[in-house]
UniProtKB/Swiss-Prot annotation:
One of its GO terms (molecular function) is rRNA binding. It comes from Elusimicrobium minutum (strain Pei191). One of its GO terms (biological process) is translation. GO terms for cellular component: small ribosomal subunit. It comes from the Bacteria. One of the primary rRNA binding proteins, it binds directly to 16S rRNA where it nucleates assembly of the head domain of the 30S subunit. Is located at the subunit interface close to the decoding center, probably blocks exit of the E-site tRNA. This is Small ribosomal subunit protein uS7. HAMAP family: Ribosomal_uS7_B. SUPFAM superfamilies: Ribosomal protein S7 (SSF47973). Keywords: Ribonucleoprotein, Ribosomal protein, RNA-binding, rRNA-binding, tRNA-binding. InterPro entries: Ribosomal_uS7, Ribosomal_uS7_bac/org-type, Ribosomal_uS7_CS, Ribosomal_uS7_dom, Ribosomal_uS7_dom_sf.
């Protein structure tokens, strides 16, 4: 039996703006990189990669980072819906907070999959490529959109 009205949603607080770059986006990115509670290491990786980005592109690192997140953010994603014994991949729109989180995860996965260099260099390279609409993270976005387009026939199953 459904409840009357909607239940209040769990609202997780966003982190405070990063002290160095004064950006909530960077603070969230540091938290995504954070591994085994070593936040200082995560902050150092982000700071070093921002320096590398500024050196390589001759642009403001925050501008490149923001452009990268915007280009890698997905607009659609696939959700599995079970209807009558069959499972369909249904394309649904992605909420803004989730789309930025997905973009950050894809950037990190792409950087981690590169081998042989320090994490700051790999991350900087992936951010630069993402801002130019290239690289593995952008490819992941394009693949997701392509799959959503292919499964457009099942869009009427979203509820």
């Amino acid at each position: 039996m459904p409840r009357k009205g909607l239940r209040p949603r769990d609202r997780r607080a966003l982190p405070e703006a990063d002290y160095k770059y004064d950006s909530v986006l960077v603070a969230r990115f540091v938290n995504k990189i954070n591994f085994e509670g070593k936040k200082a290491t995560a902050e150092k990786i982000v700071a070093d990669s921002m320096v590398i980005i500024a050196d390589k592109t001759k642009e403001d690192a925050m501008t490149v980072f923001n452009r990268c997140i915007e280009t890698v953010r997905p607009l659609l994603e696939l959700k599995a819906r079970r209807v009558g014994g069959a499972t369909y991949q249904v394309p649904v729109e992605v909420k803004p907070l989730r789309s930025t989180s997905l973009a950050m995860c894809w950037l990190l996965d792409a950087a981690r999959s590169r081998k042989g260099r320090p994490m700051a260099e790999k991350l900087a390279e992936e951010i630069i490529l993402g801002s130019k609409k290239e690289g593995a993270a952008f490819k992941k976005r394009e693949d997701t959109h392509r799959m959503a387009e292919a499964n457009r026939a099942f869009a009427h199953f979203k509820w």
